[in-house]
């Protein structure tokens, strides 16, 4: 067995396996970047509400700034630019202050239930753009704020945001490699596995309700499936040897993975219940890391059939294999963009991994990271962002960046080692 494959068996770090729209136009050429003010949440009487609401404007501001679409700022005008009615806005002071849009929100209680109303206003044209009302408990306010940030992005671009989505990842913070899930911005981390073994390669189902992952809990790297809402784990594949790098098909009916039951690792598909294993690659080299195209017709994967690990693409049924990467000697971790036009991956550059994207015809290759060592890129469902694991002097963790490499941000809330983040679709 080749040395670089042995690493996953002993260490469990797969990244080193291989030696005219109905919305506001914000991107018109020549336009300056628009500015959005986000007021603090108020109670109906105009006073500041309980502590639970204090982070709401910060959540919305951070979400919108991460999008890069407009510049958001948590801001209140003194004296107030309007009265306590959400709809009664004095636009002139906001316009004078240089803002184009305004978010106002109000929090109240109905018995033991929290009622939050958000409104987005067009300051320049003096009108309301959109509004949303939420009913729940106090701990849901952060989620409500993310949800309204999604609606703001929909109003600005025509596409809903991904700020209510989650990221699954592997962490060794307990001494064992367990799988966790957190909000996209790193808040509310929760363990999904607690078996004290090595757990790797999480991947969300297309509906975001389940994950698949590989676990060594039975002393063999087997593939499991479990819902996020239940601790029940279903064994999908326990062939002798590797059952790793599972990837859910876009329609949720199949899973592509690497199996070594016939010798070297090869790409197979199985049905979502683990049945009907079908071999796709037939090559004496190692083939791993399958990633489906968004239309489900192709699969990208990694192979060292040319001597060094490179990215290849084939039909989802196998065959018509073509080499994608021609630059670099160590290219791994392919992830197909939801938009279908690019594949993100990791390349070894001067002894460290960096994140790249390449067009699906191989003609355009762009480096997105330069600091530290960066691995395991995964796209958000709208193709606007990429999450990845990073080891750098400014802090290790799960990072998020825009698809062009800008806005790199460590979203991990605790110190430790983080691996293999993957973004949910919902």
Predicted regions and their residues:
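Short beta-strand->alpha-helix linker/helix-N-cap micro-motif
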Residues: 23-91, 103-109
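Amphipathic beta-strand/beta-sheet edge segments enriched in Tyr/Trp
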Residues: 21-22, 84-151
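Multi-bladed beta-propeller domains
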Residues: 183-200, 226-244, 270-288, 314-330, ...
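Hydrophobic beta-strand positions that form the internal "hydrophobic ladder"
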Residues: 167, 211, 252-256, 296-300, ...
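Structural motif
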Residues: 113-115, 175-180, 220-224, 264-268, ...
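Residue-level detector of Asp-centered blade-edge/turn motifs that repeat once per structural unit
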Residues: 162-163, 206-207, 250-251, 294-295, ...
């Amino acid at each position: 067995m080749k040395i670089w494959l042995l690493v996953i068996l002993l260490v469990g770090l797969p990244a080193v396996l291989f030696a005219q729209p109905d919305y506001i136009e914000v991107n018109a050429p020549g336009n300056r970047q628009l500015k959005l003010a986000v007021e603090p949440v108020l109670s109906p009487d105009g006073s500041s509400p309980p502590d639970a609401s204090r982070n709401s404007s910060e959540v919305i501001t951070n979400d919108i700034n991460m999008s890069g679409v407009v510049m958001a700022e948590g801001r209140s005008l003194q004296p107030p630019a309007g009265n306590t009615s959400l709809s009664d806005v004095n636009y002139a002071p906001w316009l004078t202050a240089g803002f184009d849009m305004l978010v106002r929100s109000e929090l109240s209680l109905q018995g033991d239930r929290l009622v939050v109303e958000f409104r987005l206003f067009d300051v320049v044209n003096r009108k309301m753009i959109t509004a949303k009302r939420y009913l729940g408990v106090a701990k849901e306010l952060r989620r409500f704020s993310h949800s309204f940030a999604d609606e703001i992005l929909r109003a600005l671009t025509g596409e809903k945001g991904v700020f209510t989505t989650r990221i699954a990842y592997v962490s060794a913070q307990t001494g064992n490699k367990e799988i966790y899930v957190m909000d996209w911005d790193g808040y509310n981390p929760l363990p999904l596995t607690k078996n004290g073994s090595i757990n790797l390669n999480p991947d969300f189902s297309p509906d975001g309700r389940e994950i698949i992952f590989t676990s060594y809990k039975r002393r063999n790297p087997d593939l499991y499936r479990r819902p996020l809402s239940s601790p029940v784990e279903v064994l999908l594949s326990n062939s002798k040897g590797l059952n790793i790098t599972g990837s859910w098909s876009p329609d949720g009916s199949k899973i592509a993975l690497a199996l070594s039951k016939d010798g070297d690792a090869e790409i197979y598909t199985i049905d979502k219940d683990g049945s009907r294993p079908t071999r796709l690659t037939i090559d004496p080299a190692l083939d791993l890391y399958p990633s489906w195209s968004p239309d489900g017709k192709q699969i990208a994967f990694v192979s060292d059939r040319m001597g060094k690990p490179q990215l290849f693409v084939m039909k989802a049924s196998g065959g018509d294999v073509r080499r994608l990467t021609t630059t670099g000697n160590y290219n791994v971790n392919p992830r197909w963009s939801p938009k279908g036009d690019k594949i993100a991956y990791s390349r070894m550059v001067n002894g460290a991994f960096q994140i790249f994207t390449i067009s699906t015809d191989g003609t355009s290759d762009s480096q997105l990271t330069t600091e530290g060592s960066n691995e395991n890129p995964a796209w958000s469902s709208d193709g606007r962002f990429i999450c990845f694991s990073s080891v750098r002097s400014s802090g290790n963790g799960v990072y998020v960046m825009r698809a062009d490499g800008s806005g790199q941000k460590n979203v991990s809330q605790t110190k430790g080692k983080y691996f293999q983040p993957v973004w949910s679709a919902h």
